[in-house]
Amino acid sequence: MERNKGKIITVTSTKGGVGKTITTLNLAGVFSNLKKKVLVIDFDLYGGAVATYLNSKNDKTIFNLITDLSNNKYKNIDDYIYNHNEYISILSAPKDPRFANKMDSKYIPIILNNVVYKYDVILIDTTHILNEINIYTLDMSDIILYLFTNDSFDLKNTKSFLTILKDAGFNN
C-alpha cells in the first residue's frame, strides 16, 4: 500500500527558551492521539532535548546519519530512528554540540525525502540560530510555526526573520 506524503511542520524561533521543544512534543502527542504516525526530528544541534524528554535509548543520532551519508555507509534511515511508541518516533540531535558544525546541510533534503512518505507528520524542532540547516528545513516545510515572546528584542528579531524569509522567496 502506497502511503500519502506526510506534512512537514517546523517549529522555530529566533530566541531560545520560548518553548519550541515542548510545543513540538505536545504536537507529537496530539497527532499520536489522532492515530497519526509522527516523526520528530531534533535539529536543535547545539542542545537538542527531544531524546532526553522521550527517554530515547538510541545511540545513533542525526550526526551519525549525515556522517554515514557522506561516507557512503548509509543503508536504511530506520537504523537511526528511535521508536518511542506505536505512533511517535524520533531522530535525535547529536549528543555532543561540537558535532553541530561538522554536519553538511546538503543532506537535509535527502533525509526529509527519505521520511516524508513513511510518516503522516514530520515535526522539526530547530535551534534559534538561522543557519543553513534551518533554511533547508524551512524551505521543505508545509507549515512553519514561529514562536516569539512579547519583548522588544524578540519583536525586532521576528521582523528580521520575516524579512529574511520574504527575501528568500517564502511568500506565505
What are these model-derived regions, one by one?
Residues 5, 34, 84-85, 117-118, ...:
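Short loop/turn elements that form and flank the Walker-type P-loop nucleotide-binding site
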Residues 110, 116-121, 126-172:
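Conserved catalytic-core segment of NTP-binding enzymes
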Residues 2-41:
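Walker A (P-loop) phosphate-binding motif
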Residues 69-130, 155:
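Cytosolic-facing regulatory segments adjacent to core modules
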Residues 15, 94, 149-150:
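Residue-level signal for short, function-critical loop segments
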Residues 31-90:
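Phosphate-binding loop that captures ATP/GTP phosphates
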Residues 26, 53-56, 104-106, 136-139, ...:
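Short, glycine/charged-enriched secondary-structure capping and boundary segments
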Residues 1-8, 163, 167-169:
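Acidic-aromatic/histidine active-site loop/patch
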